[in-house]
């Protein structure tokens, strides 16, 4: 159920250490106006929908299927939200969830921890976030990383994200850190919109001027999003005492690169042997990107992925994942990995749990329309 794509020795040691452990899950919600660019993301049918994607995902993650959600999951052009995968695992194993608002236009409808962040401007402006806000969010991330490590002293922390447009800010941060990520990132589209992403990134980076040995905080302030810096601080602090899985694809590879830059620039203490990136097979083997090649450009990052396959699902909304739609989000890959690592779940057990949630949603929709 789990494949290792890079740094097999480090990854295998991490998996062995945390086999049988129940993780805790920190989901960091953020927002960037980059997500409003037409066509930049498929996580929400329209730019208007995308403003509420993270809030709707958070509500479903915590509450599951309810008859009258305050924020219904946005209509995706093709495929259901990856939060169905995350929720299936969270519900089955009662994994503790900590929701963090790093900077949303509106507050979530379920209990959350407010980090006093703000939504990011479009990265093309070269002024995504005020620098003092970036420092504040990093400090908050470190503080909560330390707190969460005390809650799970012999286990690991999964850090997930929900940021529409986040693979584009990830590309910008990676490129700013000197990683040649152009053409290698993923997106929620079946064929990644590399040219569009790259043109937006170039606009933002040009306004920064020289990129040689750039201060990572200044880089995030210019072209990043609020989730990235919180996740970096949280992972750095938690890694000192417990395991950390950055649960995501391109966005979490960018966070890993950011972590390395922060450690290098500011001599922050961290234990990178405790840190892995966990995603889905649809991201790791995405032929319209090059996730494995990207991971290999970031020294020593262990990349794992669930081998969950949805071809045999009875729901077309799940089968389309095998055609390249959606791929990842809300820690879906990490949660699928956790289901195997904690309780040895098979492919069929996980599929049954996901389909059970979809069946509930379909039933509620039929009742609502009748």
UniProtKB/Swiss-Prot annotation:
Gene3D superfamilies: 3.40.50.10210. InterPro entries: Nict_dMeBzImd_PRibTrfase, Nict_dMeBzImd_PRibTrfase_arc, Nict_dMeBzImd_PRibTrfase_sf. GO terms for molecular function: nicotinate-nucleotide-dimethylbenzimidazole phosphoribosyltransferase activity. It comes from the Bacteria. Disulfide bonds: none annotated. Belongs to the UPF0284 family. This is UPF0284 protein PCC7424_2681.
